[in-house]
Regions:
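Short alpha-helix within the catalytic core of nucleotide-sugar-dependent glycosyltransferases
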Residues: 152, 190, 229, 233
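The catalytic Tyr-centered alpha-helix of NAD(P)H-dependent dehydrogenases
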Residues: 125, 136-143, 182-190, 221-225
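N-terminal Rossmann-like NAD(P)+-binding domain of SDR-like oxidoreductases, especially those catalyzing
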Residues: 1-173
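Short, flexible, glycine-rich and Lys/Arg-enriched loop motifs at helix boundaries
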Residues: 38, 168-189, 199-220
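Short, solvent-exposed loop/helix junctions and linker helices
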Residues: 6, 90-93, 183-187, 222-225, ...
Length: 327
């Protein structure tokens, strides 16, 4: 396939680009480089631009004869979205609309969309399946759900097929330790734990230890970035074979607590990793994990890496690159 990858110089995007190239696909990365890194994609063709720039999008697709689109480009800080909702709706929703229309006009008929488990909000039952209620609780989650809805109408009205992949908690790094999440912008638990391990963070805040979970701390479904990358490749293959749209959860189907993460990270790194119990954050659910049976059955996808590999690769990346790609 010949694929345009927006946000392809970012964390999940760059790992997906590497996998697609390794299997023989031709890839062009389209990225604003606000948060992306050239070092993460090597010699992959890169176009620096904004998804709202429809003439540029159409030119890139036409010049390279691209037939598929994977759309990662988005802001993703749920907390910030509560302070700056307009920023998220403008970039994530309006930017996506401009991109999809330009891609459609340029002849693209397959789209893989980077969605999120945040579209579900606080689950009433576990595990979370694709038909669970959709109640996003912040503008970030709402923006992703709106894009999913747009894609359904692009399919109905234009025949543009799409697969939305609802990720759970992305984590981990490349197996060689040479690519991972930029530690300067992280807000998720595992990279924050690693920042503390390398001395770039004084201590890890543990938000609540009185949840109805085995050790009282929050439980989440952590999925390795390489397994997410594989899910995108499988989604492209699914559309090429079946010519229809769908939505899939990408998670391991298992939850891990904050204290479990800390214990394993301390053992792996050999560092103390100071942590402090602080009050719960409003709206944080006690536990979240995926029902991934649909992706397993329909896509033939299954996670290959567990929590140990997530922590091992995260530590290798952060220990070798405590400031990310910054020299």
């Amino acid at each position: 396939m010949r694929i345009l990858v927006t946000g392809g110089a970012g964390y999940i995007g760059s790992h997906t680009v590497a996998l697609l190239k390794a299997r023989g696909d031709f890839v062009v990365v389209f990225d604003s480089m606000e948060l992306g890194h050239r070092e993460a994609i090597g010699d992959t063709p890169l176009v620096v631009g904004n998804t709202r720039d429809q003439p540029l999008v159409k030119q890139v697709i036409g010049d390279h004869k691209l037939d598929s689109l994977i759309h990662f480009a988005a802001y993703k800080a749920a907390g910030e979205s509560m302070q700056k909702p307009a920023k998220y709706f403008d970039n994530n929703v309006h930017g996506s609309l401009c991109l999809f229309e330009a891609a459609r006009e340029a002849g693209v008929r397959r789209v893989v969309f980077s969605s999120t488990a945040a579209v579900y909000g606080t689950p009433k039952t576990l595990p979370i399946a694709e038909d669970s209620p959709l109640h996003p609780e912040n503008p970030y989650g709402e923006s992703k759900l709106l894009v999913e809805q747009m894609l359904r109408w692009f399919d109905t009205c234009h025949g543009m097929r799409s697969v939305a992949l609802r990720y759970f908690n992305a984590a981990g790094a490349a197996l060689d330790g040479q690519n991972g999440e930029d530690p300067r912008y992280v807000q998720n638990l595992i990279p924050l734990v690693m920042k503390a391990a390398v001395g770039r963070l004084a201590k890890v805040a543990v938000f609540g230890n009185d949840y109805p979970t085995p050790d009282g701390t929050g439980v989440r479904d952590y999925i390795h970035v390489l397994d997410l990358a594989e899910g995108h490749a499988r989604a492209l293959d699914f559309m090429a074979k079946h010519d229809r749209s769908d939505v899939f959860n990408l998670g391991t189907g298992q939850g891990s607590s904050v204290l479990e993460i800390l214990k394993l990270a301390r053992a792996t790194s050999g560092k103390e990793i100071p942590a402090e119990i602080v009050p719960r954050r409003p709206g944080d659910p006690a536990a979240v994990w995926a029902d991934n049976s649909k992706a397993r059955t329909v896509l033939g996808w299954q996670p290959r890496y567990g929590l140990k590999e997530i922590i091992d690769t995260s530590w290798a990346w952060h220990n070798g690159h405590p400031d990310g790609f910054v020299k």
